[in-house]
C-alpha cells in the first residue's frame, strides 16, 4: 500500500479529512524552505505538496508566482527540490509528499529518469498542471513503474462526459480545483463544492481533495466536512512572504498550518 493510500485509510478510520499543505520548494531560500517542509507534519499537515519552481507558473496567482521567482533567484531547481524530499525522508518516513508543477522541467529531465529519481528521493505523487489527460500516457507508465501516484486535476467545467477521460490515469487522490481561475484568488460557494465532490465520487472511488481559494481555518473546515481533503497553498506562502528576514519566517506559516489543522480536525465533530 502506498504512503498516500495508507494516510487516507488512517484518516478514514479517524473520520476526518486531510489537511494538504503547499509550499514552493526553495522559497525564499533552501534552508528556510527545508525548515518549513520539515516542520509541517508536527504542525498538522497530513499530506504535503511541494511546488517545483518554474519560470512561467501560469495557473498560479501572484503569491505562488512570486514564491517561484524567489526560489529561482535563490538557486532553486528540480534537483534541489528532490534533494529537499530526500532530506525530509531522513526524519519522516510516513507523511506523503507530492510534487506539483509544470511539465517542462520534467520533460527536460526525461520522464523515465525523473520518475525513477523522484521515487528514489521519496516522492509519493505528482501533479502536472499543464499536461492534458490525452497526453499523460507519455509519463504515467514510468510513474506507475516507479510507484508514484499520478494525481489529476478536475475543475468546475469537468462534467460527467469529461470526467472519465480526466480520471483514466488517476491514482492516489483526485484534486478538485474549486474555481475556474488561478490559485489564491476567489473562493467557490460551498454548495458548488458539495455538488462537485458528489459528481466526482460517482466516477471514482479515489479520495477527493479540494483546493484553490481556501484561505483560513473556517473555510478549510467547511471543505473538510464534505471532501476527503482540504488543500491550502497561497495563504501559507503569503504568510511566509510577509515574514522573510524576520525571526518568524518559519514559525508564522507553521502557526497558520496549526490553525488550519485544528479547523480540519474539528470539522466533522
From Swiss-Prot:
User: Pfam families, alphabetically?
Assistant: Trp_syntA
Name the Gene3D superfamilies for this protein.
Answer: Aldolase class I
Active-site residues, record numbering mapped to chain: 49 (proton acceptor), 60 (proton acceptor)
As its record notes, the protein acts as a catalyst of: (1S,2R)-1-C-(indol-3-yl)glycerol 3-phosphate + L-serine = D-glyceraldehyde 3-phosphate + L-tryptophan + H2O
One of the entry's Gene Ontology molecular-function terms is: tryptophan synthase activity
GO cellular component labels: cytosol
* Subunit record text: Tetramer of two alpha and two beta chains.
Gene (name only): trpA
- Give the matching InterPro entries: Aldolase_TIM, RibuloseP-bd_barrel, Trp_synthase_alpha_AS, Trp_synthase_suA
Q: What does this protein do?
A: The alpha subunit is responsible for the aldol cleavage of indoleglycerol phosphate to indole and glyceraldehyde 3-phosphate.
Q: In which pathway does it act?
A: Amino-acid biosynthesis; L-tryptophan biosynthesis; L-tryptophan from chorismate: step 5/5
Keyword Ion transport, does the record have it?
Answer: no
State which Enzyme Commission number(s) the record gives. 4.2.1.20
Per the record's keyword annotation, is Amino-acid biosynthesis included, yes or no?
Answer: yes
Which branch of life, at top level?
Bacteria
- The identity of this protein, by name, is Tryptophan synthase alpha chain
Which keywords describe this protein according to UniProt? Amino-acid biosynthesis, Aromatic amino acid biosynthesis, Lyase, Tryptophan biosynthesis
Please give the family membership noted in the entry: Belongs to the TrpA family.
